[in-house]
Amino acid sequence: MELKTPLYDCHVAAGGKIVPFAGYLLPVQYTGVIKEHMAVRTVCGLFDVSHMGEFLIKGADALNNVQNLFCNDFENMYDGQVRYSPMCNERGGIVDDVLIYKVNGEEYLLVVNAANRHKDAEWVKAHLFGSASFEDISDSVAQLALQGPKSKEIAAKIVPEDGIPKKYYSFVKDVDVQGIKCIVSRTGYTGEFGYEFYCAAADGPKLWDILLEAGKEFGLIPCGLGARDTLRLEAAMPLYGHELTDDITPLEAGLDFFVKLGKERFIGMDAILAKGDPKVIRVGLKITGRGIAREHCDVYSGEEKIGVVTSGTHCPYLNAPVAMAMVPVDYSEVGTKVQVDVRGRRIDAEVVPLPFYKRA
């Protein structure tokens, strides 16, 4: 049976089309994916992302555990900073991709993908060592994402000036948003300027209403999962189960920047080092023929099948069909011409730089 986020009734009241996703009933759209996508690119959109998982690692060995679990380096983080990192298995495959919030030297908040919450919890607990504790606080937290060029002006109406994080990938905790205690984080999954708000689950619906009211004059609208997916694809952000799996290494997924092979160790480091340079890699494809390449479509060079599409759609802002795919390194150079099999028909495509969209 699917679960409901604390904002379920808000979505129904707003006319959201509810679908099952990652074990939850969530809105796929309200007024339409294209309208919601364009609102985020040009004005602002509000998303309920309360289905995401939140864990706490606390204790004198909290940092040592975070260093061991994740590929990125957390040694020089400041309190109030956020870092993104893959979390790998012993084979170098990706267990999940996670946001790590440093609350202080003995407390870290981990934000994980909803579909991986229980798997991740078991993984982290199984590898915890020393003086460190683990707590899954997901059910007690609501998370809302305010995304788009007008986010700053909307947030300024309801958030005290010292509660607005100034730097990208930073956060402020214990912020009073009209009586609601929040973490305000300058993060997002859309490729736009924006913030994410964390509060107690019971306060989620009230915070939703506060944000929508504050954004009314700017054209803020609620957005669903459909727009969230097209936005992240335009911004070439990988999605677990598509560009990231337990068989794909971070280097193959194009996440080299977040893999610090110079640090002492992390789970999966030995396997990644042993594999050496990746043989296959994530690339962007611009579809030049007629059609849309979807997940699982095969990629060809002539008659040779060389790879597979991991995500694909028609991107509203670009007004063009694009895709991400895993192909051999020999076919990854920008400008390489390939074909994609769409329901038995080959359509032309070309390797292009990622991301497809980058805000000005």
Report each predicted region and the residues it spans.
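Short amphipathic beta-strand starts and helix->beta connectors
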Residues: 33-42, 87-97, 128-130, 176-183, ...
